[in-house]
Amino acid sequence: MASKSDKQVTVEVNNTGRGRSKSRARSQSRGRGRSVKITVNSQNKGRRQNGRNKRQSNQRVRNIVNKQLRKQGVTGPKPAICQKATATLGTIGSNTSGTTEIEACILLNPVLVEDATGSTQFGPVQALGAQYSMWKLKYLNVRLTSMVGASAVNGTVVRVSLNPTSTPSSTSWSGLGARKHLDVTVGKNAIFKLKPSDLGGPRDGWWLTNTNDNASDTLGPSVEIHTLGRTMSSYQNQQFTGGLFLVELASEWCFTGYAANPNLVNLVKSTDKQVNVTFEGSAGTPLVMNVPAASHFARTVAQRSTLPTSMARAGENTASDTVWQVLNTAVSAAELVTPPPFNWLVKGGWWFVKLIAGRVRNGNRSFYVYASYQDALSNKPALCTGSTSGSMRTRPAVMTTLQFTQMNQPSLGHGETPATLGRSIPTSGETLKVLLTVGNPISPNETNKQTWVNKTIEPPGAVVRIGRDTQHYCTLNGFTLITKVDWFTEEFQPSEEPAPVQGLMVLGDNHKKADVYAAQQYKNPITNDKQEVTSVFLVRVNEGFQVTNHLSYFYRNSVNTDAVENIKIRSATRHTTVRFYQGSWYLLTSTVLHTGPPVSGWLWMNQELQNDQAYIIDQGIMHLITPPPVSSQIYFEMATLVPQTRSGGGETGLELVMGLSDDEYPISHVNDEEETEYETESDEDETDEVDRFDLCCTSDSEDDIENNRVTLLSTLINQGVTVDRATMITNRAFPTPNYKPRREPSNDLLAPSDCLATARSHACNETCQLSGSRGHAE
């Protein structure tokens, strides 16, 4: 660039836009490109230059040239900010097959440079990438730090290579050697160095940051790491399965063009080490990847994928607008059966997918497969030219390891939360809506016949308890096999499967047999002093077990009335065994009759089904008359927190009573015995609330009072007031004939000159006199 220091320096830059052959040199004068000619006088008048002055002169020339190049627009915009950073990306695993295996594919766009741990934290590079529209790299060093000694393992070599297009390809070990690459020996540290000429973008060296734009302008090059040769332990005659290297990127990213896209910092990168993967497709149809809906990969993708913004044609499926890169880092990539002609894509180790909206079959989530990121943005899935053979189609799903990266975020601003296909993560104690798919009837039950239920609490075999411990439990009555469980939030948005309820279990012979995932208890008054309490539990069996019991079934007591409570349990029983299998879901029920005042909160009772008692068809028993049809669905609202019972028979720590419709609540008439015996001082705190509804008038007819009672009770329940509290308020506002003697003396004595204690004492005495004939003691 420079001659001797006492001469002029001339720099000529030709930017013709495309390369031309020497035979077309004359046509360059017609000028489609741009020519920059710079002349610099580097002569320094005065004494002869020493070494320091020569360096200063060279720097002066360099600065002048760079300034002129920037003026001509040859070097692109000036960086607004530069950030040096070292990003830790994860580890390189061992080779388990002996063939070429891909271990990592590193995309260099700053918003995609994250570790694969699933962490939601972001560093300065991601933060700047979300604030500026363009980026470039001054340099890049890929550091491989050995995690094992040089003599600890043998048989494997590692190759780090540069992929300029960030597009999957079918590349052998020799093909990787044709790229710019570095071979690394296991046990030794290494650095793969890349210069700006290797990393320049299409816009005068710059790349776009927003990954929703064209793929060729945004992704930048990628760094791929492969291994060859099975990794063996030098100390043991067996395969080594640990990590070989820690991978870090040391670089300086430059940014320009401020344009804030906050959501770009929220892109997710994670790893699922145990996931079953299958591929399907036929001639002329898109290639589809299937993974279990319960897997970490499927749940994360479903939660983060946004709804499609375009409409599909009739009969077609729509795909989400969110694109995911999938990297298969296990040997099973070669074992995956793929319809032609994209076998090479899957065996290459990485590809792109989009979630198919609403498609869940046999418990699997489905994804369209794309051969490049640009194809994914353009909605051009890989089309199959044929299908897999019959023998291959019947092979079981392959267990593999998937490393996945969220490539884009269609909604880039803060704004409102976008509509997603995802599932929320339930919190402990949250009430969830549960949709249960019914399986085949459990023997001895049969379709279209009465449902057998456990009747006695002292079975010939081991007793099955559902509860907290051997003191607080319910006895198993009804049992229904469930083949599929769908969880939803209270707003009916899809939710993840909650963790098992801590402290709640199914005990068989005093040993834990199953986990309880959700529970519900329904209380329905039958008479003034009797309630039917049905507890419902959704469980999954951890250890298969069986229970031998005396079974019976419910039957209609009379056909001449429409009373819903007119069912009874058959007195004759059947001695048989019911089996529960490991890993299966079951809906278990327990029904008891509670005599006494209504009890708020959860009630633990151990009571067998009684022959001479009438039962009502409540929310739990309604599924125990005949087995529900196979594949039909049952809906419940259930809680995910263990019910805590207070000592002394007080309220429980959790109320699991769900609101019912108006016609499902028989009106409970609380007599003077119950009110007198169970009234507490806490009722005084509700005086203000009761007075709002104190509409009692002696001139009203009994029918009007009863209608007012029904209206008020229904209104309170619909407003979220508990059943017990609503009943107490209703009794005070519109007293029954038994309740009036206690209320009226108190009202008469509540004059301004009398105290509340005197009035209450007088009311109690009057009530005792009225109830003395029944032998009731206050």
Curated annotation (Swiss-Prot):
Residues 394-423 are annotated as: Core attachment. GO terms for cellular component: host extracellular space; T=3 icosahedral viral capsid. GO terms for biological process: clathrin-dependent endocytosis of virus by host cell. It comes from the Viruses. Residues 1-70 are annotated as: Basic. Residues 424-646 are annotated as: P2 globular domain. Residues 19-35, 45-57 have a biased composition (Basic residues). Residues 1-59, 670-689 are annotated as: Disordered. Residues 71-263 are annotated as: Inner core. The keyword Coiled coil does not apply. Keywords: Capsid protein, Clathrin-mediated endocytosis of virus by host, T=3 icosahedral capsid protein, Viral penetration into host cytoplasm, Virion, Virus endocytosis by host, Virus entry into host cell. Residues 672-689 have a biased composition (Acidic residues). The record marks 313-314, 393-394, 423-424, 646-647, 655-656 as: Cleavage. Residues 647-778 are annotated as: Acidic. It holds the Pfam family Astro_capsid_N. Belongs to the astroviridae capsid polyprotein family. This is Capsid polyprotein VP90. It comes from Human astrovirus-6.
